[in-house]
């Protein structure tokens, strides 16, 4: 069983504290495997291998654009999180899967999750040997006209409630997307769609991946993403489509279920998972648990999937 919480728009520090709480509870086997989905306000995170020189912008410029900076314990270099980007934080005990997973196998599964999401939007994506993340290799410029490789596109979900309503008890804002300025980016054949950076402590994972959906790609001009000079792209830039984060979240949750051979259970509230005394350090409101409409609660049950 993997329990899913949608935190909606949530500042990085709050989401990080929640991760840390869940990691400790997972180590004690007091919570199941948990998958957090979140959209962050603009923020740069620096992993253990980060070089400050990969932040190109001055601190003054970052402040003027409302970009926070956090140094964290995940692997990797510097990356950007912001509106229009789907971030996933799996809090998994790798020993709970059959067969149990090693760190490399786990990262490869995250890459496979991302590649299958991209395939849903008819984007051909691949790994690059010696690197972590998911890339697209195109022989023609990306389409910006709303048509994707000759295939019709129908949104999978436009729901604003149910399992995709931000779970109460952490952050209450709905997921939104920002306009993109990706048209300014020069076409190249090799572009990065998603970044991965994880941390594993006593077999329990934290941090995860960030998939650019409708992200304003100009923010990546502030850094050398992951210490690489290769360009960054998004689902919107590649296809001309603007799927909601809720829609992509639905695809992601089902794909996690398939690849990790687990039931996926959407939760209404953080308090469905963590006793109230354990949420004090996350600055979480404790008095307004979310209650989804009955039809959306039915969707949540339908999303329980056993591969």
Predicted regions and their residues:
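Residues immediately flanking
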Residues: 39-41, 200, 213-215
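Histidine/acidic-rich helix-loop-helix segments that form or flank divalent-metal centers
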Residues: 193-196
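Catalytic cores of Mg2+-dependent Asp-rich isoprenoid enzymes
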Residues: 269
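Short, active-site-adjacent segments that bind or coordinate small-molecule cofactors and metal centers
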Residues: 198-204, 275-278
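N-terminal lobe of the biotin/lipoate ligase/transferase fold
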Residues: 1-165, 170-190, 218, 243, ...
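Conserved phosphate/anionic-ligand binding catalytic regions in large, soluble enzymes, centered on
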Residues: 79, 202-214
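Short, well-ordered beta-strand elements within core beta-sheets of diverse protein domains
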Residues: 91, 198, 235-237
């Amino acid at each position: 069983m993997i329990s899913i919480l949608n935190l909606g728009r949530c500042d990085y520090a709050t989401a990080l504290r929640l991760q840390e709480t869940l990691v400790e509870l997972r180590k004690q086997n007091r919570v199941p495997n948990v998958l957090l989905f979140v959209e962050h306000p603009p923020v740069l995170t620096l992993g253990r291998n980060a070089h400050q020189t990969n932040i190109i912008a001055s601190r003054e410029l970052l402040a003027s654009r409302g970009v926070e900076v956090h140094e964290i314990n995940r692997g990797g270099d510097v990356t950007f999180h912001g509106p229009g980007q789907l971030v996933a934080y799996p809090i998994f005990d790798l020993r709970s899967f059959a067969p149990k997973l090693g760190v490399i196998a786990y990262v490869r599964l995250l890459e496979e999750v991302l590649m299958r999401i991209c395939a849903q939007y008819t984007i051909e994506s691949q790994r690059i040997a010696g690197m972590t993340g998911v890339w697209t290799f195109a022989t023609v410029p990306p389409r910006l006209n709303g048509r994707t490789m000759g295939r019709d596109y129908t949104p999978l979900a436009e729901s604003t409630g149910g399992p995709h309503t931000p779970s109460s008890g952490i952050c209450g804002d709905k997921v939104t997307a920002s306009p993109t300025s990706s048209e300014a980016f020069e076409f190249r054949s090799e572009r990065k769609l998603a970044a991965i950076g994880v941390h594993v402590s006593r077999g329990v994972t934290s941090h995860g991946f960030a998939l650019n959906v409708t992200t304003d790609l100009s923010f990546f001009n502030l850094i050398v993403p992951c210490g690489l000079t290769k360009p960054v792209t998004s689902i919107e830039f590649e296809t001309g489509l603007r799927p909601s984060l809720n829609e992509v979240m639905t695809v992601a949750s089902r794909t996690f279920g398939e690849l990790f051979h687990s039931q996926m259970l959407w939760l209404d509230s953080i308090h469905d998972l963590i006793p109230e005394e354990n949420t004090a350090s996350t600055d979480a409101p404790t008095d307004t648990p979310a209650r989804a409409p009955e039809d959306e609660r039915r969707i949540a049950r339908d999303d329980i999937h056993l591969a």
